[in-house]
Structure formats: C-alpha cells, structure tokens
Amino acid sequence: VGLFDENFGSYKEDVDLAYRLRSAGFKSFIILDAVAYHDRSAAGVGRTDDLVSVENKKKQSELIKYNSYKNHLMTLIKNEYWQNYLLDLPWIKWYELKKFGYFLLFDRQVLRGLGEVIGSLKDLKIKRLEIIKKRKINSKKMRRWWKN
C-alpha cells in the first residue's frame, strides 16, 4: 500500500495511510492500555459542532489550515469508494460546501489548497488506480469500518 504520501507533507497523512491499509485488507486493533501523546495546536475536546469547528480554525496557522484542507480533499479523491460516495453524497456535499463557504468568506488563502488539488488531478487519478488495484475489501466492508 506504500508509505505516507509525500505530497501530503503533514496533516491527514495518517488518515490516508489508514484508509489505504484498510482497503488492502489490513486490520487495526485497539490496545486499551496504550498511551499516546499527540500535540494538536488547535484541537479541542468536547463539542464538535460547527461553531466549535470555526473557533478551532481561528486558532490554526495558515499552513495547518492549507495542508489540512488540501490533504482532506486528496484523501477523498484517492481513497473513497464510489459506491459509498454516492450513498453519502448529500452529507459530503453539505460538509464541503460549509467548509468552502467559510474559507471563501474568512480565509481565502486556504483555498489555494483546492487549486493545488485541481492541478494534481492527473497524479491523483494515477494514485487512485494503484490503490484500487490493491483493494481486498469491498465498499460495504469499508463502510462498516467507518461506521465503527
């Protein structure tokens, strides 16, 4: 499945790798007594509604917002099963529209990430085809994984 995608740099690279590993049939496990430390400069604990998301975005650096947005879109393009995309289309579109609207109104420089993604579509298509070749689980199993 490869390693971290070098085009990501940082932010969402772990999600991309986890997505590829799971679609290739690998499983992940929870070790309940494991301790992990992860410095997140703008993550909050507790509520996760739209207002909390806006407050967290205000605390993030431009580089973090840019990479997070760009890499989120690249992860979807590279990895999402088209069947699941169609099933979730209204929610995905609503989520992406809210995020795009926020950036358009308050953080336009972050939208450079969208431009970079559009410019990378040919490369992303090649990567997507490689990922699809390595898939061992179907869209239903992947959907169950996301639901858990």
What is the predicted function of each stretch?
Residues V1-A42:
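A short, conserved alpha-helix in the catalytic core of glycosyltransferases
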Residues G9, Q60, Y102:
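Conserved aromatic-histidine-acidic binding/catalytic patches
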Residues S10-E13, S68, K93:
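Hydrophobic transmembrane-helix microenvironments that flank and shape a buried ionizable site
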Residues K12, L21, N79-E80, G101:
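Transmembrane helix irregularities
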Residues D14-V15, S23, K58-K59, M74, ...:
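Catalytic-site signature of metal-activated, phosphate-bearing donor transferases
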Residues D16, S53-K57, I92-K93:
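Glycine-rich loops and low-complexity Gly/Arg-rich segments
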Residues A34, H38-N84, R108-L124:
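Catalytic core of nucleotide-sugar-dependent glycosyltransferases
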Residues Y81-N148:
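Non-catalytic, C-terminal membrane-associated alpha-helical segments of glycosyltransferases
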